Amino acid sequence: MEFSHPDTELAGQPIGYWSWAACKAVVGHTRATLARHGISQPQWWVLSQLTASEEGRTRKELTAVLGGYLDVGSQLESEMDTVVARGWAAQDDAERLRATAEGVAFQDELAVLQRSLRARIHDGIADEEYVRALKVLQRMIHNVGGTAWHH
């Protein structure tokens, strides 16, 4: 890969631009790939949470975990509705959502897809480099008084 600038110039490049460009490219690629398989990224997050919990999750619990992901917030409720409408989850009388057998099978397929997405995104990047990049980003978030957390 050819980089955009020599290292001496990269050191002066704006993090706001490069973090935005990385987000746009990676999230755009991920969402386009998931869409080709008939699911949105927020629906995939919901389904992943449901398949990871035999007890299921309430909408409130799902919102507490997923609400801050890429500012999905207000659309999360409709994404949960879609997961139920598509038959990937069912809501019981106690208002707990649980993955259906169809949802579990679909999630298993998507897990393979997600691993291939991750492999492509991380191609040529050692785990040590990735960890360092995340720590740098977390430090920058901290430096400006921001907060971020991913389960």
Language model features by range: what are they?
Residues 22, 26, 110-124, 140-148:
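Alpha-helical linker/hinge and terminal dimerization helices associated
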Residues 1-7, 57, 131, 135-151:
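C-terminal regulatory/oligomerization modules of transcriptional regulators
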Residues 17-20, 48, 142:
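Generic alpha-helical structural context detector
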